[in-house]
């Protein structure tokens, strides 16, 4: 949810530098802000320098974030549903900030074609293009995994086995009953059948779950296998998870069955070593050369 919004005018023609600086510094102090996202559109370089040169009472990192598709989101039905009381400029700013916090969760709200990747996207079969783009987004979402207690309907829709109505039912159930404590509670969601549960459960994460496996990519069907591994090693599942030395002693051949083969067991061991691992790397702060301000400053290297 949006806690606060302000509009500042540090650049010409208003040149309200001091007033803008005071507003930003106060917001950083009040809300204990650690990072600031700046859209890469008009006056982004000037704004980045303005924000970076201010003095704060804490360390603040400044990031320049792509605005591609933000204007389309801000005028969309999704944005109106999320923030009906704000205009398109505020919605666009919210989207840019959220992209820094969790880019995947925010970008799924935008038609991939709106991001404008590739200059020939309008020359190809639009049906095939949409299918391919949707498959790519779905693949990314399922590879990363989704926090069951914070994900929006738009993010849940891309989880394998879930559609728009099921995603909305999950959000409604969460709103009415509070956060999920276990993956098994998904079975209580209206109109979410056993087949849908089977397909989606392994991609949904619950960080504070009582069973640590609920925050991993291990599917509930494989929980008994992990429990047996832990029992054989005379430790708990919690002690086994993230213990590379213990996991390294496991002989997968002992746990093969007709339904659990070598590939599945290998995936389980990899997940036990690094549960809930995120394939995305840590964000890096990219600094622009301060000497380059106009096209005339660009020289041959």
Where are these regions (language model features)?
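Active-site proximal loops enriched in glycine and acidic residues that flank catalytic Cys/His/Asp
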Residues: 6-7, 40-42, 66, 150, ...
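Phosphate- and other anionic-substrate recognition elements at nucleic-acid/protein interfaces
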Residues: 1-134
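Long, highly charged, low-complexity intrinsically disordered interaction regions
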Residues: 72, 81-179, 194-230, 267-289
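Signal for well-folded cores of large energy- and translation-related assemblies
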Residues: 25, 29, 52-55, 175, ...
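Alpha-helix N-cap recognition
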Residues: 181-182, 294
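Conserved nucleotidyltransferase catalytic core and NTase-mimicking acidic/glycine-rich helix/loop elements
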Residues: 186
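Structured C-terminal cores of nucleic-acid metabolism proteins
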Residues: 231-301
């Amino acid at each position: 949810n949006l806690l606060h919004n302000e509009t500042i005018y540090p650049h010409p023609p208003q040149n309200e530098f001091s007033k803008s600086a005071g507003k930003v510094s106060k917001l950083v102090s009040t809300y204990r802000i650690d990072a600031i996202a700046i859209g890469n559109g008009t006056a982004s370089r000037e704004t980045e320098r303005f924000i970076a040169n201010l003095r704060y009472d804490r360390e603040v990192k400044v990031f320049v974030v792509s605005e591609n598709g933000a204007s389309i989101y801000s005028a969309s039905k999704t944005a109106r549903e999320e923030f009906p009381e704000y205009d398109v400029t505020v919605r666009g700013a919210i989207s840019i900030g959220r992209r820094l916090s969790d880019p995947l969760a925010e970008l799924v709200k935008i038609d991939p074609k709106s991001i404008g990747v590739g200059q020939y996207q309008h020359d190809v079969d639009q049906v095939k293009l949409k299918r391919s783009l949707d498959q790519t987004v779905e693949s990314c979402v399922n590879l990363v995994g989704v926090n069951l207690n914070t994900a929006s309907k738009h993010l849940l829709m891309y989880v394998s086995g879930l559609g728009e109505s099921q995603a909305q039912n999950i959000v409604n159930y969460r709103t009415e009953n509070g956060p999920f404590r276990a993956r098994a509670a998904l079975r209580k969601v209206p109109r979410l059948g056993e087949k849908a549960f089977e397909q989606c459960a392994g991609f949904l994460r619950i960080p504070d779950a009582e069973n640590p496996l609920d925050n991993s990519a291990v599917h509930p069907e494989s929980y008994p296998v992990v429990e047996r591994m832990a029992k054989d090693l005379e430790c708990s599942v919690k002690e086994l998870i993230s213990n590379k030395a213990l996991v390294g002693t496991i002989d997968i051949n002992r746990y093969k069955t007709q339904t659990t083969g070598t590939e599945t067991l290998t995936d389980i061991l990899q997940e036990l070593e690094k549960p809930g691992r995120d394939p995305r790397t840590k964000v890096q702060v990219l600094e622009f050369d301060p000497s380059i301000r106009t096209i005339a400053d660009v020289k041959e290297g």
